[in-house]
Amino acid sequence: MKDFKKLFKLQWKKNAIWLILLIIGSLLINTLTFKSYTNDIYRGLTNSVESFEESLDIKKDKRIKKPKEIDKSYIEYGDKLRDKLVEKYGIIPNEELMSMETDEIDKYYAKDRSMEFNTIDSKVANYDVRRDQLLNSNSENNLFSQYTNFFIFPFLFILAMLLTSIEQMTNYFDFTRMYPWSKTKDFAMKLVFGLLLTLVVYLLHIGIEQVMMKTSGLAKLYTSSGLARFFVKELILYWIFFVIFISTGAMSGNVFGHFGLNIIAFGLFELSVFDISTIQTVLNGLDYGPTIMTGFNEFLAKQEGVLLYFLSPLRDFNLSNEMLIAHGIIAALVFILAYFIVKHMKTENSGYMVINRPLKIISQTLASLTLTALIFNIVTSTFVDYNVYIGIVLYLFLLFVSYKLFKALFNIKIKV
């Protein structure tokens, strides 16, 4: 505990200005974004109701004025107008379409529709979306869960960089080797420090969002019931991402390596499949048929559980238990790898993109193959006719250039 207090003081003295700016920046951006989010729902509902009144030719003296705060009676009024339009134009609402068979949906959309019908259909759909955002009582899909605070992810990544990759780029890192605790303990304490700071910042975000909600035009219909579970799951997600960010940072000697290892951590399987698929294309031609990429995508399309999010972590991003478990497994694997690399790291490797030689070889190889595959696919997309021999020569040339490029980058030591 004493060592943790010492590390906390050292990190705060070293990064206080950056941490304060980072926290204020994340709070400010999230505040503005959340305000825009609530205003969008308010305007969407009130504008939809006004458009319903116009479409039904309701006299102005019988229309309801736009309220400062939307209440239950206003929603009931909007529902009544919406139902009249649905009946008048024979519109099938989205929630009913979702339960229909594909053939029935195709028949519905195959009918000739007037411009007026399409306009009303769009108005009804917009109203339903906003109404659902405000009134859906499902704890997994309520007002707050419709809003994901993506701006906390840059905060987590920059915080991880300050504690790891940026520190390794400075001469201060050499001084840290004189700390009266081991390298692995230093890594573990930084992880705890970051998790606690993430908790504090997240609670500040929630507090500000709650105050803004209570003072918005949605206050009368807003309920906080069922939000505790959502907030806990969201916090777990942020903690998982921070573990990944700080673990990749601990294995990186500079910020460029930090970015690269995160790309590998989240895209290892997809990048590998892409590279192998490109090699298949090089050898067999552009029109050869299904590649390993095709098979991989078809396999993922059939998956719904943990395996889907493990193989493709950022696909269909949500807060499902399956996604949290998959990301948790990735975080645990990356953390274990980082722990052993930190345990055996040499101070003189700080400043390089990757501080461990075996990991450096793997990363450099994957980076070279991926860049080659990317450029090859871009270039060959302009070809009218593809010749296998020309394709092989082009691929080998691009691979040679990519290898030389990344070999140079991985051997550059950055110290400030």
Spans of features found by a protein language model:
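Cytoplasmic membrane-interface regions of multi-pass membrane proteins
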Residues: 2, 168-177, 249-258, 339-356, ...
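Secretory targeting signals
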Residues: 135-142, 193-257, 270
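Helix-loop-helix units of permease transmembrane domains in multi-pass membrane transporters
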Residues: 163-197
